[in-house]
Regions:
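Short amphipathic alpha-helical interface patches used for protein-protein assembly/oligomerization
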Residues: 91-95
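Anion-binding and metal-coordination hotspots
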Residues: 5-6, 10, 56, 67, ...
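Generic low-complexity, intrinsically disordered sequence content enriched
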Residues: 14, 29, 40-43, 272-273, ...
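Short alpha-helix boundary/capping elements
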Residues: 41-44, 71-74, 89
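Basic, short loop/linker segments at the boundary and entry of helix-turn-helix/winged-helix-like folds
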Residues: 23-68, 439
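Hydrophobic alpha-helical membrane-insertion signals
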Residues: 1-31
Length: 497
């Protein structure tokens, strides 16, 4: 009987963990599985040691190999990996007679080594680039929404919380006036900021406690509560509520409008695969993937409902983790913002981003709409438009869109539009006396440049490959690997998964 433990070499001259595949194991594996295992040879597993706080029976290098191999074979749960450790010849050989780790050990290892697992992923990507599997010229980015482990009905809406917080603040101000009437406070509520009101009511609560009253006295019909005890209970309840509201608003943050009670990192989003076909909101994460030559070369996760703010973090991560720099960047219209265009051009990328008006701008209705500033004559030197009736529309103001970072100009007709024969076509729903609109000239110029790039021979080739490269990664994750819903709470655990 062959000693299979001799076929697994776990260290070389430099102490580097690696895996060798021999003939007796190759007969048990499919060719594509062999290729993936050979790809793991020579990777650096030393970073896994730093997260272990005690001596473990299974070496961290071996554990990393076991987990990656199990995921390759389609086993993603810790209990499924534990069963595989007891039955699979390859993993038994890796363990070299050591008892198989149980599911808690496997789960704890994954939880502690999120950063190291991500680093292992980018080691594989760099190795793919070194052996010529990647084009290393154009990177394709796209995102998908994957449901969180949290329940559907655990939502917390920021607007609702803020509304209740305002009501609670008004009640607390009223309670301060009541405490003044009872002689428990001398602070006038009018003109005070809420922080001072909150601090004073905390003092009022302490003063009532020092009076020695029965604060737990039963209330109800036939029982008359002391006004100070009643005030104490109301103040205690509202102070607790305002703290809960402040914590919820802080957890939601400025860029979100919702969160889940059981998974505060998750945001409620409309999922495409809704069974009821009505866009039901579910707690989810926005998973972003960068692809090259049908390989996933980068991955990020966020709580954003849109893709606007995901381009820059992805490219910064690729610059940091990969040993080369891409020259072209391709994405769909979800990434069409001035901030993304400016970042890509500043850092030497050629942006092949489809404008949001790419399809609608080709329609006859759009091109014949005389009310759109895109169809008006524009004098760039003096910065004014000329409408279909030959009247001048000059710039009267400017601003910046906070969401997209795009600057715009406010333009208004120099003459009244009353009596103009084209007013009904030009100002269809507006009841203003003269034509007025906001023109995003910076974004307009960037979209024109992007449209020229996409219509070039190189742009057509990249545009044809975009859906194949970007959407193929999601087909692999969602279709083949069945990743439809995360099994862990928190954005970090979800990303590791």
């Amino acid at each position: 009987m062959n000693d299979t433990s001799k076929n697994i070499l776990l260290s070389d001259v430099q102490g580097q963990g690696f895996l060798s595949i021999f003939n007796d194991l190759s007969s048990e594996l499919m060719p594509h599985e062999l290729s993936l295992l050979e790809l793991m040879e020579g990777l650096d597993y030393n970073g896994f040691d730093s997260s272990l706080k005690r001596d473990a029976s299974v070496d961290p290098k071996d554990m990393a190999i076991i987990i990656v191999y199990s995921y390759i074979m389609g086993h993603t749960s810790s209990r499924s990996i534990e069963r595989l450790c007891r039955r699979d010849l390859f993993i038994v050989s890796v363990l070299r007679g050591i008892p198989a780790p149980d599911h808690t050990t496997i789960n704890r290892f994954i939880k502690r080594n999120g950063k190291q697992i991500e680093d292992l992923f980018y080691q594989v990507v760099n190795k793919l680039g070194d052996i010529g599997e990647l084009g290393r010229e154009t990177v394709f980015q796209d995102g998908t929404k994957i449901e969180s482990r949290a329940g559907k009905y655990t939502f917390v809406w920021k607007g609702f919380v803020e509304k209740n917080a305002d009501k609670c603040e008004a009640r607390l101000r009223k309670l301060l006036r009541t405490s003044n009437r009872l002689g428990l406070s001398m602070l006038c509520e009018e003109g005070l900021d809420f922080t001072s009101v909150y601090t004073e009511l905390l003092d009022v609560k302490c003063r009532i406690e020092d009076l020695g009253l029965d604060l737990d006295a039963p209330a109800g019909r036939g029982r008359r509560l002391d006004p100070k005890v009643k005030l104490y209970r109301l103040v205690s309840e509202d102070l607790r509520k305002i703290r809960d509201y402040d914590e919820a608003i802080a957890m939601i943050g400025e860029n979100r409008k919702s969160m889940s009670k059981t998974d505060p990192d998750a945001t409620f989003m409309r999922m495409k695969e809704d069974a009821m076909m009505n866009g039901q909101l579910k707690p989810a994460y926005n998973l972003q993937c960068a692809s090259d030559s049908n390989y996933i070369v980068g991955c990020t996760i966020s709580c954003d409902r849109t893709d606007y703010e995901t381009c820059i973090p992805m490219m910064e991560k690729l610059d940091q983790k990969l040993g080369w720099k891409y020259s072209n960047y391709c994405a769909d219209s979800g990434y069409d913002t001035v901030r993304n265009f400016n970042y890509l051009e500043k850092n030497g990328y050629t942006p092949y981003i489809k404008p949001q008006d790419w399809e609608i701008a080709k329609t006859r209705r759009y091109m014949n709409d005389i009310g759109k500033y895109q169809n008006m004559e524009y004098n760039r030197d003096e910065d004014f438009f000329v409408c279909a009736n030959g009247r001048k529309i000059a710039r009267v103001g400017s601003g910046v869109d906070k969401k997209s970072g795009s600057s715009y100009g406010v333009y208004r007709s120099c003459e009244s539009c009353e009596g103009c024969p084209l007013k009904e076509k030009c100002m269809k729903t507006s009841k203003k006396e003269s034509k007025e609109f906001q023109a995003y000239m910076e974004h307009w110029d960037l979209r024109k440049k992007a449209r020229d790039l996409l219509e070039s021979d190189k742009g057509v080739e990249i545009r044809v490959n975009r859906s194949i490269m970007a959407e193929g990664s999601f087909a692999q994750m969602k279709g083949n690997n069945k990743l439809r819903r995360f099994s862990s709470f928190g954005i970090e655990r979800a990303f590791t998964e």
